[in-house]
Swiss-Prot record:
Family note: Belongs to the TrpF family.
Main EC class the enzyme belongs to: isomerase
Identification of the protein by name: N-(5'-phosphoribosyl)anthranilate isomerase
Keywords: Amino-acid biosynthesis, Aromatic amino acid biosynthesis, Isomerase, Tryptophan biosynthesis
One of the protein's GO biological processes: L-tryptophan biosynthetic process
Catalytic activities: N-(5-phospho-beta-D-ribosyl)anthranilate = 1-(2-carboxyphenylamino)-1-deoxy-D-ribulose 5-phosphate
């Protein structure tokens, strides 16, 4: 399987289609009301329907933080195919959503400050399908532009696939992937004009950089 490429924080159907055209394997929707990239279930449904027609194999990922069952149900009904838990969810929370939504990919995101956080990430492998490592920020859950210490992550080899996030850009992606070998990458602020408004030139530059360095398979 080739490198998964997730572009997160979209709000516009045409941008979603254009980014899928460029080669994204997953599109992320922020379901956290405090985020400037927030989209409602109705907005997600509109984008999901557009993607289903043009790119049915592209994953549609809902990003949540400490969500209720009702919130998750609303976005599942809107057409997402993966649940990304980006808050303070526990192992028990993950198992509960795993049992409730067995057909959906379950991703647990962790904001990494130290090697202890990497050990915590590995503890989730029994109850999720995929892990995601993001940079820590005291006030923000994601889309901060802060990068991780890639060298410190080299020993991270969980039994589940994992995605690298945290300040990735078209300019630094090949450096990151020369040091690490995640199953996929997740970009948001690094390919934006403003929160929720993606810059298609930057997304194009991302794919050009990956292709130039033989990182697309």
């Amino acid at each position: 399987m080739g490198l998964r490429i997730k572009i997160c924080g979209l709000r516009d159907p045409q941008q979603a289609i254009a980014i899928a055209d460029l080669g994204a394997t997953a599109i992320g929707f922020i379901a956290v009301r405090q985020s400037p990239r927030y989209v409602s279930p109705a907005q997600v449904a509109e984008i999901a329907q557009a993607l289903q027609k043009t790119h049915p194999t592209v994953n549609r990922v809902g990003v949540f933080a400490n969500a209720t069952a009702e919130e998750l149900e609303a976005y599942v009904a809107a057409g997402i195919t993966s649940l990304q838990l980006h808050g303070d969810e526990t192992l028990a929370d993950c198992q509960r959503w795993r049992d409730r939504f067995p057909a959906l990919e379950l991703i647990k995101a962790l904001r990494i400050r130290s090697t202890a956080d990497l050990a915590l990430a590995e503890s989730f492998t029994d109850c999720v399908d995929t892990l995601l490592l993001d940079a820590y920020h005291p006030q923000m859950l994601g889309g901060t532009g802060a990068t991780l210490d890639w060298q410190a992550l080299q020993a991270f080899q969980p039994s589940r696939p994992w995605l690298l996030a945290g300040g990735l850009t078209p300019e630094n992606i090949t450096t990151a992937l020369s040091q690490l070998h995640p199953a996929g990458i997740d970009l948001s602020s690094g390919v934006e004009r403003s929160p929720g408004d993606k810059d298609l030139e930057k997304v194009t530059a991302l794919f050009s950089s990956l292709a130039r360095n033989s990182l697309l398979k």
